[in-house]
Amino acid sequence: MEEQVANAIEIAWNPSSDQALKAQAFDYLNQLRTDPSGWQVCLALFTKTPQHSEIIRHVALEVVNSAAQAGLIDPQALGYVRDGLMNYLRQVYGQENANPDPPNIQNKIAQTITFLFSALYGSGWESFFDDLLSLTYKGASSTSPDNMLGIVFYLRVVNSIHDEIGDVLVSRSRTEQDRANSLKDLIRMRDMQKIASSWQQILSEWRDGNDLIVEMCLKAVGSWVGWIDISLVVNQTMLDLLFQQLARAQKAELRAGEEKVRDAAVDVFTEIIGKKMKPEDKIDMIIFLNLDTIVSQLSNSPPLCENRFTFKYDTDLAETVAKLVNSTVVDIVRALEQENISAECREKANGLLQAFLPHILRYFSDEYDEVCSTVIPCGSDLLQYLRKVSKTDPSLTAQHSPILLPILKAIIAKMRYDETSSWGDEDDQTDEAEFQELRKRLAIMQQTVASVNEQLYIDAVSEVVATTFENLRQSGAQLDWRDLDLALHEMFLFGDIAVKAGSLYTKNQPNNQAAERLIEMMSRMVESDIRSFTHPATQLQYMEICVRYSSFFLYHTNLIPGVLESFLQLVHHPTKKVKTRSWYLFQRLVKQLRSHIGNVAQTVVQALGDLLVIQAEIPTEGADGDEMSSEDHEGSADAVFNSQLYLFEAVGIICSTPTVAADKQVLYVQSVLNPVFMDMEKNLAPAKSNDERALLQIHHDIMALGTLAKGFSDWMPGTSSPTSLPAPEVSEAFLQVSEATLVALESLKTSFNIRTAARFAFSRLIGVLGSRILPQLPRWIDGLLTQTSTRDEMALFLRLLDQVIFGFKGEIYAILDTLLTPFLQRVFAGIADPTTGTDDEIQLAELKREYLNFLLAVLNNDLGAVIISERNQPMFDTVITTIEHFAKDIEDFTTAKMAFSVLSKMGSSWGGPDIAPEATNGASQQVALPGFAQFMISRMSPLCWALPATPSFNPKDAQAKQVLAEAGGLQRTIYCKTGMEYIQYLRDQELPGMGMGGELIEEFLNALGQLDLKGFRQFFPVCTAR
């Protein structure tokens, strides 16, 4: 069988094997993993002499591991595995061996041995560490660990055991953690002293003999120190050995691999400091270890001092030392935050903080961002501590300036692009993203500095910005773009303390001193020659700042023309990223300054003309794949068009300013509209033939037309009817837009994209056409709600129609009367369509709710008569039936609750005047619909009991209670409209028919007659729960 398993492994992992044979081999091996006796064959395969090939031995041992972890090997058999492996280890690792196992096999054996440790160390292999330590000696006569192979394997297992039971980053179940804690206790009790002694012996014996052994040993010390007695590591013998390894940092040249030993030695000190202990003990430990001196010596070592700013600079060591600094300062600050530490400890901690401040600044200002990022946590903790102290005692703020100012200057300096950066280079997108992420972290630290000492922050940033603009004035385009970008970035962040409620001003005065300074900065920036902003990054920053602080221009209107001119240059920028972003920023700027722009429409339309040409591009295959980066997406055809829409909106905004005469508005609008109309006409025929590019072109055209309308009026339907429509001649021009869109929609209504664009245009045209659009409403509905329209589309259009009803309730009755029946028939068809998945069900629920919302909009806006008009009377019963169905839906409480709301509103609208004593439902009184009172009693009232009568109904469910409260509201409405007739019906028919007892019936009727609406809504859910 051994030969059979070996052959199967060879076939499975041989690239040239026949695929069918390979599949059989894998099936066989998978069966072997679950076979209770399979591990025995594989253990024999692994330990066999002469040895099988590496892949056979690796897979064989993997099967043994798998069986052990799956519980296929009982404790007695685990002892057999232990004995077999230990015999193998003594043969191969217990003596000099010319052909040692490769690292992957060593790791696999260590993994198996670690599992056996977990299973048997408590009971069955108490001599575990003695057995492994025996491998580190060549023979009985050896007085110190002298067997290299055995030492490496021993350390491999020691590190593996830490990973298994000591690593705090590994997620464990409660049971696993309890077992790990138990094993750690046993180690501490039985073997920890001899393990620590073995480390000392190995480091002493091999300190210069084998870098791999020393590195592995240091890693073991560093990882185990967190959960063992600290004195086993922090003692003079061990510290001397550690300092010997740290001395490697002073070498100008290291042999290959030696740097790993040096870094591992530094990591041991970091782990010692990271060990949990009382604040006083931690501060004393930092002083005892003389970490300030250690860090100073490391910082002044050749790799970090002489080689700094050269290609030889050792970033790995810099990052390793930065971790030590970070860990130490975090603990110093943590001690200072404790209110109950002694005055002596606080004094020591403050002294350490002063000593470590240069170290923080050294690594924080390191030119490599990964080094800087390593000390950001401790810098943030320090600043948070200073903020807390300054709030408790403001008088200490000035004392902290010597700490704060150098940190703030370091933060600002680190915000600057370094000399090697090349902004916008496609090859550096990852670096750019990482730098922007670093800037965000630095900005948070900067805000904390400002919260500790705002004046210090204001002065520091003001100085940087003022100096930069002065240099710009003197040297112009010769100024390094990185310096200008830094100043602009700081200006952008400065608004966090200067801007209040979106403005720099309150009651025509600057908000505060920060706002005053920022206004000065803005003046310097805007009055600078834009041609000096030669780099795309600074040009983009310029626009972002103008938009963020647009309130500045409201008080400096003389500067607006110059800024507009700058923007009109930048919207033609050759860099796509800058150009497309500038289109959005231009729209934002003109929207915020709409009333102060002046009559510049002709200039703007002419300047933007070439950018308003719409060029639809079919997305290339795979453009939607997961591999597309955000940068790629910004440059995609779809993203570019979406940015282009901002230009159309900007044109609408500028052309509709009060300073532009109505006839000129029409002229400018027509100059934008006519090319789009011509393009639509040209593409309509091929689009009808399903030409993909033509369809997309018309989609883009319609979106552009709708967006232009949006620029003219930012009124959104649903707020109120447009209070200031454009001049009649302008509205007439947009009627052409509506007509052109409808023509395209009527021809291409089977296209989802065309319907989507048309729905958007419709919503925007309302704002410029007002009630003029109402006569076209039937055509819009016919085009937007087709046989192929999704439920989602119907729901969106219903929501839009609600807003139209609200905005034009005085003028829409006749049109609504004409279109209601065919419109609702399409909605009912959408509701009736079967669902095929979760997405369908979600869309169906949304459509139901929007349908009920539509009915409520009609009723709430005094248009209820349209539902029962002569034209729509035949549809009325279907309307009621759907509402009844929704009211009984136990799967959708939200819809059920709305259904009861609609029924209550119908009762209020058509039930006639209130006749019950003291009935006050707040509804406007309307003429009674003949027969509706009886209809409410016979059809609506029984619905209130349908849900609670359902076997699966849970009256304690929060949503269920809300539905029942709404049902109670309906009953109260019926009572208000019908009075004693309803009471009599309930007493004689409905309640007894449900099996309700006489006493409960009287209690229910008393509550209905005596409680107000709110009281009965609360009573009904309680009543049904009995």
Curated annotation (Swiss-Prot):
The keyword Nucleotidyltransferase does not apply. The keyword tRNA-binding applies. Belongs to the exportin family. This is Exportin-T. Keywords: Cytoplasm, Nucleus, RNA-binding, Transport, tRNA processing, tRNA-binding. It comes from the Eukaryota. GO terms for molecular function: small GTPase binding; tRNA binding. GO terms for biological process: tRNA processing; tRNA re-export from nucleus. GO terms for cellular component: cytoplasm; nuclear matrix; nuclear pore. tRNA nucleus export receptor which facilitates tRNA translocation across the nuclear pore complex. Involved in pre-tRNA splicing, probably by affecting the interaction of pre-tRNA with splicing endonuclease. It is found in: Nucleus; Cytoplasm.
